[in-house]
Amino acid sequence: IVFSIPNNIQNKSLESHLIENKIKYHKGSENNVVSRYLKTAKKFKAKNIIRVTADCPLVDPKMLDQMLHSFKANKIDYLANIKDPFNKHDKYYYPDGFDLEIFTTKCLEKSFKKIKTKYDQEHVTTFIRNSKMFKRQFVKNDVELTSLKLSVNTKKNLNDVKKIYNIFYPKINFSFK
């Protein structure tokens, strides 16, 4: 596990925690997140990247294993369990908060060279998701859960996720299902 964190004063305590616990990390641009991810990948010689963001703390280990298997077996550039931007009518995707993305460092390099907007620089995989130049795949869910929101962007979101963790604690590697 490697953290890719913004180089700013707000992350000093996080950086201290990472150092104290001997967790690998790289600091980079706060606004050009694609650049930060790419530099992190190169620093640690990563061929592939599994992206889990701080606002989506609910990682399903079984889902991740299945996605890794599919990613390797299908030799694709990008795999995610989020909504496919080219399939706007599909409602069968995973709830916000369980987001997982797997992509190659080569794919990230190609997108970095093509990106022209600040929005795409700030949102690591938006360009990749919205471009047909990459071999992309989106994992679908069996049920419609578009209204379920488990990402952490507010205090209420954080309290909701804490309740979920407390229900399963100490077995925190619970499955989405």
Predicted regions and their residues:
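Short internal beta-strands
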Residues: 1-7
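Generic beta-sheet signal
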Residues: 4, 28, 52, 81-82, ...
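Short phosphate-binding loop-to-helix
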Residues: 7-74
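Conserved core of the sugar-phosphate nucleotidyltransferase
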Residues: 16, 59-148, 163
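Short, surface-exposed amphipathic charged segments that create phosphate/polyanion-binding patches used
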Residues: 40-43, 93-98, 150-157
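Hydrophobic helical membrane-anchoring modules
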Residues: 150-177
